[in-house]
């Protein structure tokens, strides 16, 4: 399966039990900041934004004072899982980022999608990739 198929079929799909509800944007990005695959709607990000995200995985709390920035959008960092998941909130939407062995899986959402639904979609794929050694 191509990386693009993972984004299209596992991240940008309808959320279970909620036909028509899906993430706004999603991507799989290597730890080095290279985009493996992304939805057409995923924001163009700056290298320093991805560097900040990777630093927060290695030093949990790094982004808390400044917020998480991606594609010029600032998200308030909320409870995640140290070294594994970063979650951010902006208005009625937000972002979930799950770290795997070689990449990060990113999902961005807006209402009516809930934070929990975004977490489920992103973390499920991230856990699968970890199981596959990726």
UniProtKB/Swiss-Prot annotation:
Cysteine pairs bridged by disulfides in the record: 13-118
PTMs per UniProt: Phosphorylated by MAP kinases.
PTM-bearing positions, type Phosphothreonine: 114
Span(s) of short sequence motif Involved in PIP2 interaction: 84-100
Gene Ontology cellular component list: cell cortex; cytoskeleton
Role according to the record: Binds to actin and affects the structure of the cytoskeleton. At high concentrations, profilin prevents the polymerization of actin, whereas it enhances it at low concentrations.
Additional remark text: The variability of the residues taking part of IgE-binding epitopes might be responsible of the difference in cross-reactivity among olive pollen cultivars, and between distantly related pollen species, leading to a variable range of allergy reactions among atopic patients.
The protein's name in its UniProt record: Profilin-2
Natural source organism: Olea europaea (Common olive)
């Amino acid at each position: 399966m191509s990386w693009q198929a993972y984004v299209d079929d596992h991240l940008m799909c309808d959320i279970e039990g909620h036909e028509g509800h899906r993430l706004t944007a999603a991507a799989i990005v290597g730890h080095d900041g290279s985009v493996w695959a992304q939805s057409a709607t995923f924001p163009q990000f700056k290298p320093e934004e991805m560097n900040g995200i990777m630093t927060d995985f290695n030093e949990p709390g790094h982004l808390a004072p400044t917020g998480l920035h991606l594609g010029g959008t600032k998200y308030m960092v909320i409870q995640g899982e140290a070294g594994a998941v970063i979650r951010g909130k902006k208005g009625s939407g937000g972002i979930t980022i799950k770290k795997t062995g070689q990449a990060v899986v990113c999902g961005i959402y807006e209402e009516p999608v809930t934070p929990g639904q975004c977490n489920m979609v992103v973390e499920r794929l991230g856990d699968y990739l970890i199981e596959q050694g990726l």
